[in-house]
């Protein structure tokens, strides 16, 4: 998949493994690197959703439209589809199989 970042600061924080580990610690840093590699290698968001360890799911409430992917409890990688027109199913839900571009919003504790 094609990845972009919500800010230049975030892009710098997630630029390489050494920087990620320095910013987020060894355990979280390695897990973040793994998730970024999985996102890059996946053809679409549905592929990532099939990996049970990611616990990828859509959020609701004030974070509606965002997608959460587990990093290491309690942290989550927050994403949004980066398409000009967000792929939707006929029922209005997100069509995970057609999402091929994602914007990373950040790594946060959503709880």
Residue ranges and their predicted role:
Residues 44-65:
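A short, surface-exposed loop/turn module that caps and links secondary-structure elements
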Residues 6-12, 23-27, 54, 97-111:
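Charge-dense, helix-prone N-terminal extensions
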Residues 1-37:
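Arg/Lys-rich, positively charged N-terminal/basic patches that mediate binding to nucleic acids
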Residues 69-111:
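Enriched for short, Lys/Arg-rich terminal
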């Amino acid at each position: 998949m094609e990845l972009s970042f919500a800010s230049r600061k975030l892009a710098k924080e997630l630029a390489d493994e050494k920087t990620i580990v320095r910013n987020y610690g060894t355990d979280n840093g390695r897990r973040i690197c793994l998730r970024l590699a999985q996102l890059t290698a996946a053809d679409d968001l549905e592929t990532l959703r099939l990996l049970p360890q990611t616990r990828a799911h859509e959020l609701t409430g004030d974070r509606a439209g965002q997608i959460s992917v587990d990093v290491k409890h309690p942290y989550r990688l927050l994403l949004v589809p980066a398409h000009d027109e967000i792929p939707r199913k006929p029922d209005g839900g997100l069509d995970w199989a057609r999402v091929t571009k994602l914007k990373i919003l950040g790594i946060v504790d959503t709880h």
